A protein has these predicted regions:
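N-terminal catalytic cores of secreted or lumenal carbohydrate-active enzymes
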Residues: 37-221
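Conserved, mostly hydrophobic/aromatic
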Residues: 60, 95, 166, 226, ...
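N-terminal signal peptide c-region/cleavage motif recognized by signal peptidases
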Residues: 31-33
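Acidic, Ser/Thr/Pro-rich beta/coil linker or hinge segments at domain junctions
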Residues: 417-471, 475
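Noncatalytic carbohydrate-binding groove/subsite architecture in carbohydrate-active enzymes
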Residues: 140-147, 174-305, 312
């Protein structure tokens, strides 16, 4: 009998025959826990709108070497139709090139023809650029010449210039950094008087430099925003147990990591109304963690990460991307990639699905969204974000990070606070079988994003699930649901 008990215990989880199984077990005189859906109340407060989400909030970051041709063929090219389509489908409006290799003397600096191909792509994809120049053993005159070329020909696609990448790794003081950085900055300004910049592009270990940078350069009016980097999970190679790694990636404790980093460099910027952006970020550095960064866990993490930083006033995040990335001065597999090259275009990794879902709902200003699970499930790993558009359309994103054998579904009641919300739609992001380790077969609105960038947008009407401003939806474990409601 004990073996039957255990067999039924394993089988009943997430099974549509659960009520019948429970009855049969009861008749046998056994007592099994019944995993029901957890009631959750989400209360929206639109009275005090918060940060407005920038149109180019979700961006990508690449190594500068990606501008170079590979056997005569360019990755970034106006002729690369699948890549252009991927950018358009995901809604990528901010493209940064830099990374470790921008400061590697062993790597070639892009030439003007390389730059022309790159900006041809940017125009075709309708994305704007943060363009980086070499700082480590940099050449002020060469950087200035390239800046003039870019500004003369491609100013409509340019956001700003950045000089160097994570200089705190090889220059160990702000004073030492300034000695190398300012000659390049001055040389560019001499030939491009209206040039705009961002900086200082540091790791998460050197936040005070950001304040020094603001003091010395922001008053000039030439700084678009302060930019920093973050890989909240640390080195990907240290994650040796994928199950534990996915648990870590989805842990509520990661919000504490973000908050700690925020507290170290953002408050003085916020007080002075100085914008900031995470110019390079992802979950684990050195290319990510195997069987963690490349799974559905990263999709849920990505949605949450984007919204957390948007809610804390960031102007955006550029997820580092590529087929391979620089781990220090070596090349490593890019496990945290948003997408990688495939025979017919680009294989879209789970993180891209998170980016796409975010862009479907990130229209307007963030408003209050309070999650209150049932008293018996206070530890439910579900987060909610709400955005109010100028036309009063309300978007509510529900991320149920519960997963694996003990993952709990959520029956959510959303109190919008206004009976005028009488109609709406939902779109769900799911993994096959609710498998948090899934790397393919993901669905957003019932369709996958294909290698050629094609995706069919399909929403589901709420119908009777909305009444008098209250919305009732189910959010299964290991899934994300975006709810969009409009007034009568």
């Amino acid at each position: 009998m004990p073996s039957l008990y255990l067999t039924l215990l394993r089988f009943m989880k997430n099974n549509r025959l659960l009520p019948s199984i429970q009855l049969a077990v009861t008749l046998m005189g056994l007592s099994l826990p019944l995993w029901g859906d957890v009631p959750v109340t989400v209360t929206i407060n639109t009275a005090a709108p918060g940060a407005k989400i920038a149109d180019d909030f979700a961006g990508l970051s690449y190594e500068t070497t990606r501008e170079l041709p590979d056997q005569g063929k360019y990755y970034f090219s106006a002729q690369n139709a699948p890549l252009i389509k991927i950018f358009q489908t995901l809604g990528i409006k901010n493209l940064r090139v830099g990374g470790n290799f921008v400061d590697s003397p062993r790597k070639a600096i892009p030439t003007e023809p390389d730059i022309d191909e790159f900006f041809g792509f940017a125009a075709a994809a309708d994305t704007k650029v943060i363009y980086s120049f070499r700082l480590n053993h940099g050449d002020p005159a060469a950087s200035a010449a390239q800046a003039k070329h870019i500004s003369d020909k491609y100013s409509s696609s340019l956001i700003c210039y950045s000089i160097g990448n994570e200089p705190d790794i090889y220059v160990h003081s702000y004073k030492g950094w300034l000695k190398e950085w300012q000659p390049i900055y001055d040389a560019i300004n001499q030939v491009v008087p209206d040039a705009k910049f961002c900086g200082p592009s540091l790791t998460s270990n050197a936040q005070p430099w950001a304040h020094d940078f603001v003091r010395d350069f922001y008053p000039s009016g030439k700084v678009v925003y302060v930019v920093q980097h973050q890989y909240a999970g640390g080195a990907g190679g240290k994650i040796t147990d994928p199950v534990a790694g996915r648990d870590l990636l989805l842990s509520p404790g990661w919000h504490d990591i973000y908050q700690k980093y925020y507290d170290k460099f953002v408050p003085p910027l916020k007080a002075a109304n100085i914008p900031y952006r995470l110019e390079e970020a992802n979950n684990f550095y050195n290319g990510g963690a195997k069987d963690v960064s490349d799974t559905f866990a990263s999709a849920m993490w990505g949605v949450d990460y984007l919204y957390w930083w948007a809610d804390h006033g960031s102007q955006g995040i550029n997820f580092h991307n590529g087929d391979e990335v620089a781990a220090g001065q070596i090349i490593a597999p890019c496990r945290y990639a948003s997408f990688t090259s495939a025979p017919d275009g680009y294989f879209v990794h789970p993180l891209s699905y998170g980016i796409k879902l975010f862009n479907l709902g990130a229209h307007g200003q963030l408003v209050g969204s309070t999650v209150a699970p049932d008293d018996a499930a206070k530890d439910l790993n579900l987060v909610s974000y709400a955005v109010l558009d100028a036309d009063k359309t309300l978007y509510v994103t529900l991320i149920n990070k519960e997963h694996d054998a003990n993952g709990r579904n959520a029956e959510v009641t959303i109190h919008t606070g206004s009976a005028s919300y009488a109609q709406g739609q939902t779109i769900a992001l799911t993994a096959p079988g609710g498998d948090v380790s899934a790397k393919q077969g993901l669905l957003l609105g019932g369709d996958s994003i294909h290698d050629d960038g094609a995706w069919q947008e399909k929403w589901t009407d709420l119908g009777a699930s909305i009444s008098a401003g209250d919305i009732h939806v189910k959010v299964p474990a290991c899934s994300v649901l975006l709810v969009k409601v409009t007034t009568k």
